[in-house]
């Protein structure tokens, strides 16, 4: 036994121990897909994990969802295994989000669901027996954007503002194969500028300054944001004989994993290969802790969550809204009374004119009668 082995304590084996524990227990990961229908959320999810996680909705079901005019929460669970490592995956979809003419407040049910998962975990964590905690806290939210001229639709911007306060938000440009490289570059710049100007919290991976290779990799991922993605579950044979996931068009083939065609690989890296544990850790140590502290400041131990309608701020806003409504009603009533008085005055004026005309007509009739009587007298 040499001197190095004699002085070896074993601290350096701690990462190996951690690796064994994680490998044995696996990891639970919850992903939310948010955005209007028709942007390829289901296709992307199945492409991301190289298996069918979610089934596509048929035309009848899509029409039924549109008729309901409500945002729903759909939960899909799956157990994935790769090289003896288990991933307990939960996918949260939001059918109906942003699909209606009036989409004001459509994000409220999504934010409420995210907060409910923090609330559920916090209440379970306060129980004596915490061995069977059900953790549904959402680790990442992919927000699918349809590019517009000014970068982001007002509804999407407002939704991302609220959602980003509770979850790791990752905006993506859906169906990138519909745009030219020039258009995509322009959309990316505009979207980034809008999000930065309005202070929307977009997830940024932690940079490891001590690992130059990993640092460059993460910097490359950040430079690609917002990710322009293409999804496909079909295998396509390229002219050079390769079989790839992609889409075939008359002008050529779009390869999903070709970085010159889209940012799918970079998005997969941030979600799975490079930053999944960072997403989980950020959720647990930052976002959940922030929610827990906020609730502890306004609640006693064991007290149920303050509902929106019981919130003092909400009541104040409700009272202000009631006052504004009352004032508006008063103004409208005053305006109506003034309008009514003008109508009455006009009616009275018209009635007076009408009476005067009746008097004139009577006088004319009497004059005619006198003239007739005078004419008859002369004839006699």
Curated annotation (Swiss-Prot):
Binding site for GTP: 35-42, 70, 96, 175-183, 231, 247
Region ranges (G1 motif): 35-42
Any GO BP annotation: mitotic cytokinesis
Domain Septin-type G: 25-298
Domain of life assignment: Eukaryota
GO cellular component, one term: cell division site
UniProt keyword Translocase present: no
Family: Belongs to the TRAFAC class TrmE-Era-EngA-EngB-Septin-like GTPase superfamily. Septin GTPase family.
Protein name: Septin homolog spn4
Organism per entry: Schizosaccharomyces pombe (strain 972 / ATCC 24843)
């Amino acid at each position: 036994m040499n001197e190095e082995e004699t002085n070896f304590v074993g601290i350096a084996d701690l990462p190996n121990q951690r690796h064994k524990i994680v490998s044995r227990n696996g990891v639970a990961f919850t992903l939310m897909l948010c955005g209007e229908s028709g942007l390829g959320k289901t296709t992307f999810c199945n492409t991301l994990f190289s298996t069918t996680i979610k089934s596509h909705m048929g035309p009848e079901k899509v029409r039924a969802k549109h008729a309901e005019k409500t945002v729903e929460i759909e939960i899909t669970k799956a157990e994935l295994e790769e090289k003896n490592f288990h991933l307990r995956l939960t996918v949260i979809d939001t059918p109906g989000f942003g699909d209606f003419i009036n989409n004001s407040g459509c994000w409220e049910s999504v934010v409420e669901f995210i907060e409910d998962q923090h609330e559920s975990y916090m209440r379970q964590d306060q129980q004596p027996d915490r061995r069977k905690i059900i953790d549904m806290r959402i680790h990442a939210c992919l927000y699918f954007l349809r590019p517009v001229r000014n970068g982001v639709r007002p509804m999407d911007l407002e939704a991302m503002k609220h959602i980003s306060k509770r979850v790791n938000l990752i905006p993506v440009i859906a169906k990138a194969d519909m745009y030219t490289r020039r258009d995509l570059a322009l959309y990316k710049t505009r979207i980034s500028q809008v999000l930065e100007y309005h202070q929307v919290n977009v997830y940024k991976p932690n940079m490891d300054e001590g690992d130059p290779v990993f640092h460059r990799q993460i910097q490359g991922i950040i430079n690609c944001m917002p990710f322009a993605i293409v999804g496909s579950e079909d295998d396509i044979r390229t002219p050079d004989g390769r079989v790839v996931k992609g889409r075939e068009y008359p002008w050529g083939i779009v390869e999903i994993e070709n970085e010159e065609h889209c940012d799918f690989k970079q998005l997969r890296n941030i979600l799975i290969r490079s930053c999944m544990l960072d997403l989980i850790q950020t959720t647990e140590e930052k976002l959940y802790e922030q929610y827990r502290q906020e609730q502890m400041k306004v609640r006693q131990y064991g007290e149920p969550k303050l509902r929106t309608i019981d919130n003092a701020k909400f009541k104040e806003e409700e009272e202000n809204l009631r006052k504004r409504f009352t004032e508006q009603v008063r103004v409208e009533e005053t305006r109506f009374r003034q309008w009514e008085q003008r109508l009455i005055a006009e009616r009275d004026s018209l009635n007076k004119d009408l009476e005067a005309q009746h008097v004139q007509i009577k006088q004319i009739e009497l004059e005619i009668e006198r003239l007739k009587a005078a004419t008859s007298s002369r004839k006699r």
